[in-house]
Structure formats: structure tokens, C-alpha cells
Regions:
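Aromatic-rich carbohydrate-recognition surfaces in CAZymes
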Residues: 219
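Metallocofactor- and cofactor-centric catalytic cores in central/energy metabolism, strongly enriched
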Residues: 1-177, 181-193, 200-215, 224-235, ...
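Positions that flank functional sites
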Residues: 240
Length: 305
């Protein structure tokens, strides 16, 4: 168990087709760096830790169809313009370049406008996963803003760590984050105890939901998630305080919990967390197969600076 045969094929982020018994099968639920397993006439993509002796694992490392493996890298490229040319970003999608028509210093207001329109569509037709770092819990305005996004129905799941939840709850309970006022950033006397006292209190109640209910906590990100019934995955870290009782300390349990949502995700927005962004990116394919068989693009946004 847990060992692939020599010459196994490793998945990419792209749609991949496998010729099995004369028919081309699409891997419907993919994940990069995992292996394709043929089972009951379908292709399942599994992590190495989940493969078992006897699994029919696809072997082959060419990707243009000659070994019965086709990786479709251009399925979501921009449509040609009036002269038959692809948009600049599409032409250079496989090449690193400092400038793709616009520099990194260029304002991204156009992208935000597109994201607004996308989220309006996804609220009714998709599954939006947000991946968040603790920076959002250190500012009262950002906590309020994201709470409104949750309440408005633009959030289907949240991935974070112990820190985001801890300091957000600290903000609701003590009006501080790491002992600093969440509005003025002024240090509070003995404020360095506040996040520990918050963790301790939540552990007393056994869950974030019960802590919010019993302590009549209002406002903040975790309160909005609990009130709206939005699921969240809190993945543990080796540097966590506490942790909160719902934090998953086993990294692979956390991966599996995250992937259960990413199997449905159509848009992913990652903000202020390099670790969780990379982890989520590794588990997110560029496409999603809908119930009616439609293959659609998955949108992935990363805002880290």
C-alpha cells in the first residue's frame, strides 16, 4: 500500500484524458502530483497515501496522446482576437516573464472589477472557497468587511489556521488582537494574555460555536461563519498556541478536509497567507466537471502583498 509502480503517471493541474479500452476518459476530480487510478470505468485521482496494492494505476510519462495520455493545457486559453492572435497572457502562459503587457506595479483595479462580477455569478452558480491569513483578524475594518461578505452569501468555505480564528475571537471577546486594540493598534495592559485567555475559554466550552453562544460573542469572522453555517477548515501548525479545539493537528487530515471542499470549488480566493495558499494551490485543478458533464474553468486568485 502507498507505493506506485515504476513509471507511474503524475497528474498536473490541467484536464487529462486517458485511453482505456479504446475510450478516452477524463479525470473528473484531479489533483496535482497525485496518481490516476482506473476503477469501474472511471479515472480517480488519489494521493500516494491513499493508493492500495492492486490498484490499476496508469503508467506513462508522455502527455500528447501517444501513450494513451493527453494533457489538455490550452483548453481555457483566451479566444483569438480579430487578427487571430491570442491575448498576450495566453501566448506566454507557459513562460515566465516580468511583463505580460502590464508590470507588477500596475494597479489591479480591472482585476477587482472582474472579481466582483465573477463573485456575483458564483454566489448562485458556483462554490467559492476563501483561504485567509491572520492579518484579517488584526484590523477591525477588515474583520467587519469580510463578515459582510460572508453574510451576503459569497463564501461557501474558509480555510485558515489557528491564528486567524484565535485572534478574530480575541477581537470579539477583548477588542484586541495579540493584545493590541483592533482599531487604534494601541497596546492594552497585559494584552499579551488576551489570545491565550481566549483559547483557554474556547477549550473550556469545547467548540467555537458553543463559546460564541455561551459568551454571547457578536461580530467578527468566526461569528459570521457560525451564524451563516459556513464550513471552515482550521489546519494546525507546529507553532500554534493552544490550539483551539477544532484545529486539525494532523496535516494529512487537514489536507483531506480541505480537498473535500476543493472537489467542489469553482473559485478560490487566497489572501495574506503564503503557506495555506501554496497548500490550496497544490490541491486545486484548473477545471471542474459539473453534474451535467460540462467542464468549466476554476478561478484562482492570490493576494499576498
Amino acid at each position: 500500500d502507498g507505493v506506485a509502480p515504476e513509471g507511474y503517471h503524475a497528474m498536473s493541474i490541467y484536464p487529462e484524458y486517458f485511453k482505456i479500452d479504446g475510450a478516452w476518459l477524463l479525470a473528473e476530480d484531479s489533483r496535482m502530483d497525485c496518481v490516476p487510478v482506473c476503477e469501474d470505468g472511471r479515472i480517480f485521482v488519489r494521493e500516494f497515501r491513499h493508493i492500495r496494492a492492486g490498484d490499476a494505476i496508469v503508467c506513462g510519462r508522455t502527455e500528447s496522446g501517444e501513450q494513451g495520455i493527453y494533457v489538455h493545457t490550452t483548453g481555457f486559453d483566451p479566444a483569438p482576437d480579430g487578427e487571430g492572435e491570442l491575448a498576450d497572457a495566453g501566448r506566454h502562459a507557459d513562460n515566465f516573464a516580468f511583463r505580460l503587457g502590464r508590470s507588477r506595479e500596475t494597479a489591479f483595479s480591472r482585476e477587482y472589477d472582474e472579481l466582483y462580477e465573477l463573485l456575483k455569478h458564483e454566489r448562485e452558480h458556483g462554490y467559492v472557497v476563501w483561504v485567509m491569513g491572520p492579518a484579517f483578524s488584526f484590523n477591525g475594518f477588515s474583520r467587519t468587511a469580510f463578515s459582510k461578505i460572508i453574510e451576503a452569501g459569497y463564501v461557501d468555505a474558509v480555510f485558515a489556521g489557528n491564528a486567524l480564528a484565535t485572534h478574530d475571537l480575541e477581537g470579539s471577546y477583548f477588542h484586541t488582537a495579540l493584545g493590541q486594540d483592533i482599531e487604534t493598534q494601541e497596546n492594552r495592559p497585559l494584552g499579551h494574555y488576551n489570545h491565550l485567555d481566549t483559547i483557554n475559554r474556547v477549550r473550556l466550552y469545547g467548540s467555537i460555536g458553543r463559546f460564541i453562544e455561551e459568551e454571547q460573542v457578536s461580530g467578527g469572522i468566526m461569528h459570521a461563519l457560525e451564524k451563516k453555517g459556513v464550513p471552515y477548515v482550521l489546519a494546525g501548525s507546529i507553532r500554534d498556541d493552544g490550539p483551539l479545539p477544532c484545529v486539525l493537528g494532523n496535516a494529512y487530515d487537514a489536507q483531506d478536509a480541505m480537498r473535500s471542499h476543493l472537489r467542489k470549488a469553482t473559485t478560490v480566493v487566497c489572501m495574506a497567507t503564503m503557506l495555506h495558499t501554496i497548500a490550496t494551490g497544490n490541491m486545486t485543478p484548473s477545471y471542474r466537471v459539473l453534474a451535467d458533464g460540462t467542464v468549466r474553468q476554476v478561478y484562482f486568485y492570490c493576494v499576498d502583498i
